[in-house]
From Swiss-Prot:
Transmembrane segments: none annotated. This is Keratin, type I cuticular Ha1. Residues 364-416 are annotated as: Tail. Pfam families: Filament. The record marks A305 as: Stutter. The lineage of its organism: Eukaryota, Metazoa, Chordata, Craniata, Vertebrata. Residues 1-56 are annotated as: Head. SMART domains: Filament. The gene is KRT31. It comes from Pan troglodytes (Chimpanzee). Residues 56-367 form the IF rod domain.
Length: 416
């Protein structure tokens, strides 16, 4: 804090070449630290060698106490500043791992989980595509199965129709055979009747008539009937063989188609069974992948919640540390401002001390060379310098001119 002193008008000379210098015995300071303490000097004629009046001694003592307290306060502030710096350094060293925690392991775990999730998603997509392909293949096989089933039904209906035709032909054959048998019986009956009639006529006529008639040659009915029978039998046999050959051919073709259809049906059924097994296995694997995905999502959610809570705690800790650091910085700025104020006060005090020292030295140069003959402003002799009045005064040393000293720019005072 600045000191306000009432300084009297002082006439300071820059050189003391016109006056003798004060002897070395008279340049000694009467108070400890008086060379560095500003003094309240009223007039150059108020003091003489080794003597001050009471007000000047009290002022010097007061200024000495003030300067000592000021220096003690400066030392105390420097010690406090050093302690605060050490405390800040220790706090920064202690809280450095808290301010910069290592999340590399958590980041690696999160990256691994993300990679697993991506792999699971890709595997899930691949399984979905495979399931869709299996469904499409199953639909194709189902369509083929329906087509083959309709073809089989058509072939079975054709076989049933051919069987009905075969039954009809068999019935026709049996009817024709029955007609042939009836015709044979009728022929036999006609033959027997004819023979009986011939015999009867022979018996009636006897030997009475011998009629020779040139008649046309008789027709052998048996031969005609046999020929007709053979023709019909040949025709029936031909028709039968043709029908049997056609039926055999159709039956063989149908059997081949049935065999091929049954083989294809068995292969299709085996493929359908295999596809059903594959679909069941894929559904089980898909369910397992869904469960794994759900568990991974739950784990990720728990990890995110845990890490978010830890991050909030760390952020709150960082906020507290930043607030403490801001408070410490504000305290440091305030103490720095106080320290700057004290430095300014110290500089002003040093300037005043230098000014007072220059004034004291200039007044010391104005003292006479013989201190015993010095008189005060009232023209009253001041006692001898020595304590023993009988001891003569020692002649002073020869005067050495004082060299001019540089002055301080801001306060226009002498530099030590």
């Amino acid at each position: 804090m600045p000191y306000n002193f009432c300084l009297p008008s002082l006439s300071c000379r820059t050189s003391c070449s016109s006056r003798p210098c004060v002897p070395p015995s008279c340049h000694s300071c009467t108070l400890p630290g008086a060379c560095n303490i500003p003094a309240n000097v009223s007039n150059c004629n108020w003091f003489c060698e080794g003597s001050f009046n009471g007000s000047e001694k009290e002022t010097m003592q007061f200024l000495n106490d003030r300067l000592a307290s000021y220096l003690e306060k400066v030392r105390q502030l420097e010690r406090d500043n050093a302690e605060l710096e050490n405390l800040i350094r220790e706090r920064s060293q202690q809280q450095e791992p808290l301010l910069c925690p290592s999340y590399q392991s958590y980041f690696k775990t999160i990256e691994e989980l993300q990679q697993k999730i991506l792999c699971t998603k890709s595997e899930n997509a691949r399984l979905v595509v495979q399931i869709d392909n299996a469904k499409l293949a199953a639909d194709d096989f189902r369509t083929k199965y329906q087509t083959e089933l309709s073809l089989r039904q058509l072939v079975e209906s054709d076989i049933n129709g051919l069987r009905r035709i075969l039954d009809e032909l068999t019935l026709c054959k049996s009817d024709l055979e029955a007609q042939v048998e009836s015709l044979k019986e009728e022929l036999l009956c006609l033959k027997s009747n004819h023979e009986q009639e011939v015999n009867t006529l022979r018996c009636q006529l006897g030997d009475r008539l011998n009629v020779e008639v040139d008649a046309a040659p008789t027709v052998d009915l048996n031969r005609v009937l046999n020929e007709t029978r053979s023709q019909y039998e040949a025709l029936v046999e031909t028709n039968r063989r043709e029908v049997e050959q056609w039926f055999t051919t159709q039956t063989e073709e149908l059997n081949k188609q049935v065999v091929s259809s049954s083989e294809q049906l068995q292969s299709y059924q085996a493929e359908i069974i295999e596809l059903r097994r594959t679909v069941n296995a894929l559904e089980i694997e898909l369910q397992a992948q869904h469960n794994l995905r759900d568990s991974l999502e739950n784990t990720l959610t728990e990890s995110e919640a845990r890490y978010s809570s830890q991050l909030s705690q760390v952020q709150s800790l960082i906020t507290n540390v930043e607030s403490q650091l801001a408070e410490i910085r504000s305290d440091l700025e305030r103490q720095n401002q106080e320290y700057q104020v004290l430095l300014d006060v110290r500089a002003r005090l040093e300037c005043e001390i230098n000014t007072y020292r220059s004034l004291l030295e200039s007044e010391d140069c104005n003292l006479p060379s013989n201190p015993c003959a010095t008189t005060n402003a009232c023209s009253k002799p001041i006692g001898p310098c020595l304590s023993n009045p009988c001891t003569p005064c020692v002649p002073p040393a020869p005067c050495t001119p004082c060299a001019p000293r540089p002055r301080c720019g801001p306060c226009n005072s002498f530099v030590r």
